[in-house]
Amino acid sequence: MSKSNQKIASIEQLSNNEGIISALAFDQRGALKRMMAKHQTEEPTVAQIEQLKVLVAEELTQYASSILLDPEYGLPASDARNKDCGLLLAYEKTGYDVNAKGRLPDCLVEWSAKRLKEQGANAVKFLLYYDVDDAEEINIQKKAYIERIGSECVAEDIPFFLEVLTYDDNIPDNGSVEFAKVKPRKVNEAMKLFSEPRFNVDVLKVEVPVNMKYVEGFAEGEVVYTKEEAAQHFKDQDASTHLPYIYLSAGVSAELFQETLKFAHEAGAKFNGVLCGRATWSGAVQVYIEQGEDAAREWLRTTGFKNIDDLNKVLKDTATSWKQRK
């Protein structure tokens, strides 16, 4: 991994003293609006969304090495973060066009890597939906798109964090048994691809390679993977890249995410941290809407703190320094 001194210094600002990225993800936009809409009849307002992000930043960033925010609703929160907390800013538009095939990527049109850097970002994050089994006419567009962003980040000398979410258009439910069977290959092959130097990715933000709800010992119903098979998928994931990689929480509970990290570590995965979002703060949404700012702050200081503190303890025992991979 040949990174510039500036990129290395920037990633250091995003990680803790042990070289582990213990980052808080709150760049949700569409998903957050849907969460909020469950608890109120009117459309969530810009002020509501911005204020909730500010609350989370004020209360939890002292316990995180960095925070991932979006430049659409998250800039007030970026100003409210702890002075020692690094900043990643998202570059992609939220969601994808459900009417078009391929889940093609799209940048926020009024932003660039240069502008995100000027806004104070220590890194640019971009989310890509990718299916290694999709038609090449779709995937070549995605590869070219990531090459552009990678080149932009090289030009601005700012780290590029690529988040890859896998899918299969033929399997609408990615929580299904059918998707669980194909997920390991899709996750690990995508990681392998985007580790190629041509993409100039510095850190991969990825899914765990299995659906833990179908792993023997974790499953309540059908088992798709034995513990040994699941462990092998984590080993294969680690071998699929030379780049630092961190796990996303994918909306699972705090407890399951922590158990997953322990399992990954025991399997031999030398992951370098997390970008954990909903598993840490999701419970604050309902409290904020139904009981107001003070109650949400109290939730963040108690349950939210416990979630992030427990996660940090697990990371201390399970994650390895990204510097071992460079």
Swiss-Prot record:
Enzyme Commission number, as recorded: 4.1.2.40
BP GO terms, sorted: 6-sulfoquinovose(1-) catabolic process; D-tagatose 6-phosphate catabolic process; lactose catabolic process via tagatose-6-phosphate
Organism domain of life: Bacteria
Top enzyme category: lyase
InterPro entries for the chain: Aldolase_TIM (IPR013785), DeoC/FbaB/LacD_aldolase (IPR002915), LacD_aldolase (IPR050552), Tag_1.6-dipho_adolase (IPR005927)
Pathway entry: Carbohydrate metabolism; D-tagatose 6-phosphate degradation; D-glyceraldehyde 3-phosphate and glycerone phosphate from D-tagatose 6-phosphate: step 2/2
Disulfide linkage: none
Record field: catalytic activity: D-tagatofuranose 1,6-bisphosphate = D-glyceraldehyde 3-phosphate + dihydroxyacetone phosphate
Keywords: Lactose metabolism, Lyase
Family statement drawn from the similarity comment of this UniProt entry: Belongs to the aldolase LacD family.
Record-given protein name: Tagatose 1,6-diphosphate aldolase
